[in-house]
């Protein structure tokens, strides 16, 4: 059985944990939690019967195979370094942290040196397998257009001085590079970094706030020597965290299951 620890105990962590608990094959189990908000970690531990850790050091010192980061971009560096140094592989949900090229290279080299793995799930978009394969050729264009309900972008927009109550129709609130996008929308546009890493090409990003939208819509366009890849996914937002698509959480669950099963489908 794959023994899992979780960093960050919000809605996504709860969804992942409960899905693994309900898996009849029982090939992976969450055994311990840590969150900077200790009350959240203790609450989720009590709900699931897992251990509650008072520090990240305590979590990574436990007998675990895998650490799943569900916290924030600011938690990624510390989580990965301590997990790898304690012999654990890591799944990163807050992949926006890897828009920092220096951090990505630093953690890549550490994982390589220690012969451990850092896993980045496909998240809330479709076609990542095809994009990865296509990146072996020449990529000439990568574009992501994301449309979300206004309330899902509310915090990021208001931090930029926009009054979301004044958005009465679909409004383009951002156009620019993946690096600019993740700095302005760190909890909303992780998929742009996944796409850029998979394609090995910096994505152009457009974000639309739509007051009538009820789903998170991600449209991908990739052009290269292999031809053209176009995908469109309309995701239901996570019920308890509308900034994130439910599919993003399910992609982590699927990855954990793949790591514990003898046959893996897809690139």
Curated annotation (Swiss-Prot):
Gene Ontology MF terms: aspartate dehydrogenase activity; NAD binding; NADP binding; oxidoreductase activity, acting on the CH-NH2 group of donors, NAD or NADP as acceptor
Gene3D superfamilies: Dihydrodipicolinate Reductase, domain 2, NAD(P)-binding Rossmann-like Domain
Source organism superkingdom: Archaea
Signal peptide limits: none
Keyword terms: NAD, NADP, Oxidoreductase, Pyridine nucleotide biosynthesis
GO biological process: NAD biosynthetic process
Keyword NADP set for record: yes
Pathway entry: Cofactor biosynthesis; NAD(+) biosynthesis; iminoaspartate from L-aspartate (dehydrogenase route): step 1/1
Binding site for NAD(+): 124, 190
UniProt function note: Specifically catalyzes the NAD or NADP-dependent dehydrogenation of L-aspartate to iminoaspartate.
Record-linked PANTHER family: ASPARTATE DEHYDROGENASE DOMAIN-CONTAINING PROTEIN (PTHR31873:SF6), L-ASPARTATE DEHYDROGENASE-RELATED (PTHR31873)
Stated family: Belongs to the L-aspartate dehydrogenase family.
Identification of the protein by name: L-aspartate dehydrogenase
Gene name for this UniProt entry: nadX
């Amino acid at each position: 059985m794959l023994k899992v620890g979780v960093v960050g105990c919000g809605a996504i962590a709860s969804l992942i944990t409960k899905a693994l608990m309900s898996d009849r094959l029982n090939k992976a189990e969450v055994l311990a939690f840590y969150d900077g908000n200790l009350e959240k970690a203790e609450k989720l531990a009590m709900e699931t019967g897992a251990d509650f850790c008072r520090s990240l050091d305590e979590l990574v010192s436990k007998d675990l195979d895998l650490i799943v980061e569900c916290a924030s971009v600011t938690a990624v560096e510390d989580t990965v370094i301590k997990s790898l140094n304690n012999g654990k592989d890591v799944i990163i949900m807050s992949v926006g942290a890897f828009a920092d090229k220096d951090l990505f290279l630093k953690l890549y080299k550490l994982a390589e040196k220690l012969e451990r793995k850092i896993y980045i799930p496909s998240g809330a978009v479709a076609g990542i397998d095809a994009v990865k394969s296509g990146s072996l050729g020449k990529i000439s264009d990568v574009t992501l257009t994301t449309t979300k309900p206004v309330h899902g972008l509310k915090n990021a927009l208001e931090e930029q001085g926009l009054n979301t109550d004044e958005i009465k129709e679909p409004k383009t609130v951002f156009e620019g590079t993946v690096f600019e996008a993740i700095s302005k929308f760190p909890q909303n546009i992780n998929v742009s970094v996944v796409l850029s890493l998979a394609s090995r090409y910096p994505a152009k990003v457009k974000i639309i706030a739509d007051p009538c939208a009820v789903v998170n819509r991600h449209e991908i366009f990739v052009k290269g020597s292999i031809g053209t890849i176009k995908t469109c996914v309309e995701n239901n937002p996570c019920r308890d965290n509308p900034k994130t698509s439910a599919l993003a959480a399910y992609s982590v669950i699927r990855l954990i299951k793949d790591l514990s099963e003898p046959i893996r489908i897809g690139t």
